[in-house]
């Protein structure tokens, strides 16, 4: 069986470092291992419309922005197929068929859907398209025969529901659909990076993001104003690591080599944490260190992005070719499922 990855993002804005450590960095690593036969990266504009239908320009204008972020971060069109979801009608068709395999009550019980409904204040009036998001996601996964789906921990209920749909289809008809394996982020800090203000989620709407496209000055300003330990008032005060956003970011980004270059008084992050917990280490010092780490990590991405942005014709050509390739695969899957289910047997 071919090893295939499917992953992607909703184009509701430029990508930030939460996207980067949560999935994008891992995608680049997986792409470069050569261990997978196909890697499909989806710009999920159709799914983005489920809660942005009154503002389609927001979605449309960010397709190119997300594509820029993808390629700037290291996704290679020669190794990964980057495509636009709405330009593959077979995905909508698959979603329609799978809707018959799921009850409304099951969709309403999905923990991820419930959390997203609350966050978006949809309790009084839930868009049907939003409620059916897990079904659409299942169509995406199965259309490209994905064997591996990298997700954050908050998306696990969505993948479990996708497996349920796959299992039900295979039980009713023939076992032609593949149940995908789940691939979680590398470490706990990467599961869901908090915002710079210490909020549980980095969010464009909350204004607490560091974007991949941010300038060095913007990155520094955001880091220097970052939430730390409110009880760590004096340098001599013992500090807390748990819930300290600066240390969460260091967990996600820094290596021992960073200490050699920027903070040679310490061998590694564990030593820095121990000193902070004892007291005698100021927030300004660790913020300056984090700024050096982040500038080193993000500078090559920003520079590649600036170069790519000078030739958007190339970027859109990549999307066009990727979408054409992805549609061929989705059409093959749709044909197979119609044949298996005898849906068009008399035609």
Task: Report residues per predicted region.
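Conserved small/polar residues in nucleotide/adenosyl-binding loops
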Residues: 339-347
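Mature, solvent-exposed C-terminal subdomains and processed small-chain segments of exported/organellar
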Residues: 278, 283, 292, 296-315, ...
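Active-site cores that bind ATP or allylic diphosphates and position pyrophosphate for catalysis
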Residues: 114-295
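N-terminal Rossmann-like or analogous alpha/beta NTP/dinucleotide-binding catalytic cores
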Residues: 2-139, 296-298, 302, 306
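Active-site catalytic microenvironments for nucleophilic, acid-base chemistry
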Residues: 26-29, 33, 165-172, 346
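Non-catalytic DNA-recognition/assembly elements of restriction-modification systems
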Residues: 317-321, 325-329
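Long, low-complexity C-terminal extensions of enzymes
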Residues: 299-302, 327, 333-337
């Amino acid at each position: 069986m071919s090893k295939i990855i499917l992953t992607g993002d909703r184009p509701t804005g430029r990508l930030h470092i939460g996207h980067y450590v949560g999935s994008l960095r891992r995608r680049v690593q997986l792409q470069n291992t050569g261990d997978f036969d196909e890697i499909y990266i989806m710009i999920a504009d159709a799914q983005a419309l489920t809660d942005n239908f009154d503002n389609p320009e927001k979605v449309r204008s960010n397709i190119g922005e997300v594509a820029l972020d993808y390629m700037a971060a290291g996704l290679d069109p020669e190794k990964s197929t980057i495509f636009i979801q709405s330009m593959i009608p077979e995905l909508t068709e698959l979603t329609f068929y799978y809707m018959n395999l799921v009850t409304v009550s099951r969709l309403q019980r999905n923990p991820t859907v419930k959390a997203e409904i609350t966050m978006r204040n949809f309790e009084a009036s839930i868009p049907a398209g939003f409620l059916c998001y897990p079904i659409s996601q299942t169509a995406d996964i199965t259309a490209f025969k994905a064997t591996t789906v990298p997700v954050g921990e908050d998306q696990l209920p969505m993948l479990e529901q996708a497996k349920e749909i796959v299992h039900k289809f295979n039980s009713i008809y023939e076992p032609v659909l593949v149940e995908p394996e789940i691939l979680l982020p590398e470490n706990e800090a990467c599961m869901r990076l908090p915002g710079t203000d210490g909020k549980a989620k980095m969010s464009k709407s909350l204004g607490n993001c560091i974007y991949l496209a941010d300038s060095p000055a913007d990155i520094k300003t955001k880091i220097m104003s970052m939430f730390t330990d409110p009880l760590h008032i004096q340098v001599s005060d013992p500090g807390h690591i748990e819930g300290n956003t600066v240390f969460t970011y260091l967990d996600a980004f820094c290596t021992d080599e960073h200490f050699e270059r920027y903070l040679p008084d310490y061998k590694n992050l564990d030593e820095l944490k121990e000193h902070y917990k004892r007291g005698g280490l100021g927030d300004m010092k660790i913020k300056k260190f984090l700024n050096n780490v982040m500038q080193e990590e993000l500078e090559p991405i920003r520079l590649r992005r600036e170069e790519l942005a000078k030739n958007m014709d190339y970027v859109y050509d990549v999307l066009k070719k990727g979408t054409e390739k992805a549609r061929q695969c989705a059409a093959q899957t749709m044909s197979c499922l119609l044949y298996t289910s005898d849906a068009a047997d008399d035609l």
